[in-house]
Each structure stands twice: as C-alpha cells, then as structure tokens.
Amino acid sequence: MYRVFEALDELGAIVEEARGVPMTAGCVVPRGDVLELIDDIKDAIPGELDDAQDVLDARDAMLNDAKAHADSMVSSATTESESLLSHARAEADRILSDAKSQVDRMASEARQHSERMLGDAREESIRIATVAKREYEASLNRAQSECDRLIENGNISYEKAIQEGIKEQQRLVSQNEVVQAANAESTRLIDTAHAEADRLRGECDIYVDNKLAEFEEFLNGTLRSVGRGRHQLRTAAGTHDYVTR
C-alpha cells in the first residue's frame, strides 16, 4: 500500500510542477511518466486484496476453532452427565435392594418370634392342665386366656414390625431423588456448554466484522484517492491534446 501512496504523491508533484497553458487553468504533463505511475498503482492494489483474503481466512480459522471448542465442551458435558446418571441409577438400585432385604429379614424375625411365643403359650397351658387337674376348667380357661393374649401380642408385634419395615422401605425409596438431581445437573452442564459456544461465536463474528470494516474504510479511501488521480490525469490529458492541436 505504501507504493500506492508514493505513486499518488509523485502524480501530485508532476501536476504541481507541470508547465501551465497560457490563458487556461490547464497544464502540460509528461504522458509517459504519468502512465508509468498509474501502472505502479495498478500493480500495488492486488497486494491489498491478498491482505483482505488473509483476513477472511483468519476469520474462517477462528470460526472453525470456536466450533471445535464448543463441540468438545458439549461432548464432555454429555459424557459427564451420562456418568452421573448411570451412577445414580446404580445407587438407587442398591438402595432398593437393601431395603427389600431388610424388610424380608424383619418380617422373618417377626414370624419366628410369634411362633416361639405361640409355642411357649401352648406348653404353658399343657403344663398347667397336667399339674392342676382339679382346677382343670379354671386352669384351662386361664391358660386359654393367656394363650390368646400372647397370640394377640405376637400378632401386634408382627404387624408393628411389618409397618416399620414398610416405612423404612419408603424412606429408602425416596432417595431416588438422587437420580433427579443428576438429571438436573446434566441439563445445566449442557446448557452452560451451549451458552459458552454461542458467546465465542459472537465474539469471533464481532472481531471479524470490525477488521473488515477497517479494511473497507481503508479501501474506500484508496479508491477515492485513485479516483481523484484519474480525474486529474484525464483533465491533464485533455489539455495536452488541445495544446498539440
């Protein structure tokens, strides 16, 4: 670009130093020198176009880098969310299995306890009947009452153990909220990755647009300078032909 301005300065110097035409505002300039300077300007301008292409290539490279970075972030977020979800599911399955095992164990213990109590009550009733035949009826009634009471207590204990086991199962099942928390976290990570990708694309577009605007302003100034030079050349060429005739 330096050669363009240098050639324009030389054109200006030629016009300023040219010999004037009497009784006109025109002047006589050396046609060969002027045409040579114009050729120099034409040769220098393609170099600036190459610079513009370099800016466009840089923009494409930045866009590709931003897209690759965004794709990497989205892939990492997806992998992490899948890992969290898998871990949460495994944890929920383990908790459910532990709860079921605990409920089964408590129910089995309650049944065994009830059976032991029933056996003890029956043995006690038989012993009382054998020892006190004379009080057979009274003893039998007392034994039966005691048996019924023990059975009822055993049933109450059994039902209580079952209810406690169900409550414990419900409490453990409620821990499935871990899965929901993992889903929410994975969604947040993916949204963050998309937002970061959009921000990088926006910054890249702004940078490229600013550079192109600067280059556009520079080229417009150059074209205006060349236009003025051509206008001056045409004016000078018309005057020279008039003097020759």
From Swiss-Prot:
Gene3D superfamilies listed in its UniProt record: F1F0 ATP synthase subunit B, membrane domain
Domain of life: Bacteria
PANTHER family assigned: SLR0848 PROTEIN (PTHR38010:SF1)
Family stated for the protein in its record: To M.tuberculosis Rv2927c.
Name this polypeptide is given: Uncharacterized protein ML1661
